[in-house]
Amino acid sequence: MVRIGNSWDEILADEFRGENYLKIREFLKDEYSHHVCYPSMYDIFNALKYTDYYDVKAVILGQDPYHEEGQAHGLSFSVKKGVEIPPSLQNIYKELQSDLGIPPAKHGCLENWARQGVLLLNSVLTVRAHLANSHKNCGWQQFTDDIIKKLNERDTPIVFILWGANARSKKQYITNPIHYVIESAHPSPLSAYNGFFGSRPFSRTNEFLKSAGIEPVDWRTE
């Protein structure tokens, strides 16, 4: 049985006991024993470990983990300190500077966001090395859709930040009118100029949180 170490254990108890997760677990046992996969098995649930269910103020949905060595550590868009900052995250930092005047960090670790209540959740939590989307059909999508549905049930407001078509497809699960959805193009260099730049997701998140009487996020990462 997986142990997250906070209220997610109770919230997701049925999911972790269910047939879908058992299928995921068997798939991962085989994948991790025969191939290089990311993140480390110990980091798969870091998004949930760092951000308790009842502490979630905002959700930034990613697609699947970075698939090169040393990058993925269980938080969407984030890399460990000392690892080169990927292009999508460089663009996130550019928008953060444009939006709130926060200079780009010298590292790509977003742990500070996670510890303040920003759930950095990928819709697929693992990947085989060098093969983007290689685990997309193993059951993770259903598992993380269930997480979004659980968050939708919360009676305190959450900001859902959906970048790109994959993330925006999850909007169907956000039906509770107390929540706030921010949508735009993905920060990837392929699409950032199609509506990500200039979308001001960070200030808009904080404006909404303050209007709901919730402490805003300090978006600095260092």
Task: Give a label for each model feature.
Residues 2, 14-162, 166-169, 174, ...:
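A polyanion-binding, active-site-adjacent surface
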Residues 5-8:
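Short, contiguous pre-domain boundary segments
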Residues 194-196:
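A non-catalytic structural micro-motif
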